[in-house]
Amino acid sequence: SNGVPELGMVHVPVSGMNYLGQVGTGAWKVNPEGELQEISVPRFSKGQSAVRVVASRNHRGELVDKLIIAMLSNGHILLEGVPGLAKTLAISTLAKTFDAKFNRLQFTPDLLPADIIGTQIYSPKNEKFSIKKGPIFANFILADEINRAPAKVQSALLEAMQERQVTIGGESFILDKPFLVMATQNPVEQEGTYPLPEAQVDRFMLKVIIDYPKKEEEKIIMRNNLAKTFPAANAILKPKDILRARDLVKEIYMDEKIEQYIIDIVFATRYPEEYGLNKLKNMISFGASPRASINLAAACKAYAFIKRRGYVIPEDVRALCHDVLRHRIGVTYEAEAENINSEEIISDILNTVEIP
């Protein structure tokens, strides 16, 4: 039908963004200015607002946006922040809003891979092994303090994240869709921890750093919590709505100039001198991998989607650059001695690379 593929109930434009697509009960259309007039299912943005309202009881609206970006781009999030900043609240609220299954894994030094993925149990009665699935079989996983468990446990989780399947007793099981892992690290306590190797950290689409709330925000948090006057999360959407929205996100338009901008930013982390950033040459021990370009492009499309736009703009790239790149750039001892971290390196690159 005139080059428009059908994805279930979603009609998606291949080229030209002025096509009206029906999605279940709602419509997604892009007007001549390229704005998304209604987003996928109109309930989707309602779901997003609902999550934001509940999470805002602890002022975590920006974290919710990042979770939704990862969810729409089929990625995972690494969170760094001290305890008590409503990380669990944000992801459990998101799961409730999408009527999805949520599990929390508390990582400890004595945890075993079988505790996460599941194991075989022998039944003497029927003299057979049966499979007992682990808590990894859920849509949303909170891996709390991932750096507290030994490497073999971390790699079991990271393999599941990458392959989206696990093997128990030689049998493979596909994980639920959607599948989002939010892993947390406490930046303060480093004693008795097992730091994630660079190759493992690279598998997280975003690394988000959460800071303390501002004075006014904390006053509202305190009042709301004491008065117990916070909104409850209701199931507004279903997991299948996420999968539908993902199909639409893929169709968000990204101009070649934006693609080039993303490539230039990532290449500047590898070859800073080619972009006139000679001072960074001795500050970077290794630059971002091709995963950075792929993830930055995917995240920008999802960001445009939640901002109700049918196309990506340079501001989207700049807004997400730190989250996508901060854990993919290695800094040298020289940089550490001068108190220069990856944040400053990314800011220097953004200030230098030409904006399309």
Q: Language-model segments: which ranges?
A:
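Acidic beta-strand-loop-alpha-helix segment within the catalytic core
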Residues: 2-66, 233-239
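An extended, acidic
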Residues: 35-66, 251-260, 269-273, 281-298, ...
